[in-house]
Design a protein with these regions (language model features):
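Glycine-rich portal/gate segments that line the openings of hydrophobic small-molecule binding cavities
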Residues: 1-8, 19-21, 25, 32-104, ...
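Short glycine-enriched loop/turn motifs at secondary-structure junctions
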Residues: 9-14
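Acidic, Ser/Thr-rich low-complexity intrinsically disordered segments
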Residues: 171-177
Length: 177
């Protein structure tokens, strides 16, 4: 997958996936607006988003993503991942500034109505860092947090798709304006 060569011998490697009843272009708007100070993580808001609810609508100002953009990972914006590559409606790759971690998000059409949403995190722990004790916590919480995040994206994308089919209107433009 994109980014695998950037972290060739990761200490932590986790690939998660969910099938979404929607096309990649219907999922993409939810995916690229993800993050702190953006639409949230669609996960446990009390933990991931400091109690602020994740968005239930497409937010127009977060619909453009370019290589070099920083995806904040902390509320103060001091920690973040840089967008390393992006293929709209297909995939995006983030990486940390130290070159020790990548986070990949991909959309793979399964058939005319279904898409596999896949995310992969690869990182090399820095055991000499003052944050070294945080590393085991990442492994312990990652599966629950990512499951909730993926299911949150799935729920939103499928609801938008159902609404679009029911009303015949483009939900993205309806919700954003």
């Amino acid at each position: 997958m994109p980014g695998d060569d950037d972290v060739p011998r990761p200490t932590f490697n986790a690939t998660r996936a969910v099938t979404v009843v929607a096309r990649p272009e219907q999922i993409w708007p939810w995916l690229i607006q993800i993050g702190v100070g953006r639409a949230g993580w669609y996960s446990y808001d009390w933990l991931d988003n400091l109690g602020r609810h994740s968005a239930e609508r497409i937010i127009p100002e977060f619909q453009h993503l370019a290589v070099g953009d920083v995806m904040p990972m902390s509320p103060d914006g001091k920690h973040g991942n840089v967008v390393k590559a992006v293929e709209p409606n297909r995939w995006m790759l983030w990486g940390d500034q130290a070159g020790q971690a990548t986070w990949y998000w991909g959309l793979y059409p399964a058939d005319e109505r279904h898409t596999r949403l896949i995310t992969r995190v690869r990182m090399r722990y820095r055991w000499t860092s003052p944050l070294a004790l945080f590393n085991p916590l990442v492994e312990f919480t990652d599966i629950a947090m990512m499951r909730k995040c993926l299911l949150g994206i799935k729920r939103r994308a499928e609801a938008s798709t159902r609404c679009r089919h029911r009303t015949g209107r483009d939900v993205v433009s309806h919700l954003s304006g």
